[in-house]
Amino acid sequence: MEEDDMILFPVLAFLIGVIAGLRALVAPAALSWAAWFGWLHVADSWLAFLGWGVTPWLLTLLALAELVADQLPATPSRKVPLQFGTRLVSGAVCGAALMMALDLNAVGLSRAEMATEGLVAGLLGAVAGTLGGAGVREWLAARFRRDSPAGLLEDAAAILGALGIVSAVA
């Protein structure tokens, strides 16, 4: 474990929270695949379900449904309580998963301390991603004079960002 990892992982936990703020299910789907492939070591934790055989497939299907639903005009704002809360929970859980992937012996923190640090970083990232993503999308939609191109760009940013974070962990 290098000292840089002690800085990198909280940043990644924050960033996966941002991704969850953009798309609530893209972040857990990406981390679930990372756990399934053995890149994210959460098998001996309360997040072991992320690596179970069916979980990545299920989360991927749900993420795809979210991407489709987001393009529909009747989809509620991400800032309504249920949508906002879902993104916060997703960001917090994903942040915890990233932090718990660290080599605990090298860091000198307990699993609970790592999970708490990840929960907080992911939660803050989710707030930033939810509110910032909404603002950027509104700005882009005004420039495009339509919402769908802005939504597709946001989808691409969420997917590519999640892949980048997973590749940094792998």
What feature does the model see in each segment?
Residues 17-35, 161:
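The first (N-terminal) embedded transmembrane alpha-helix
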Residues 64-80, 131-143:
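C-terminal ends of transmembrane helices
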Residues 66, 86-96, 155-159:
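Core segments of transmembrane alpha-helices
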Residues 78-89, 147-151:
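Cytoplasmic-side transmembrane-helix entry/capping segments in multi-pass membrane proteins
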Residues 89-97, 118-135:
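Mid-bilayer segments of alpha-helical transmembrane spans in multi-pass integral membrane proteins
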Residues 138-156:
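Interfacial loop-to-transmembrane junctions
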Residues 152-169:
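Final/C-terminal transmembrane alpha-helix of multipass membrane proteins
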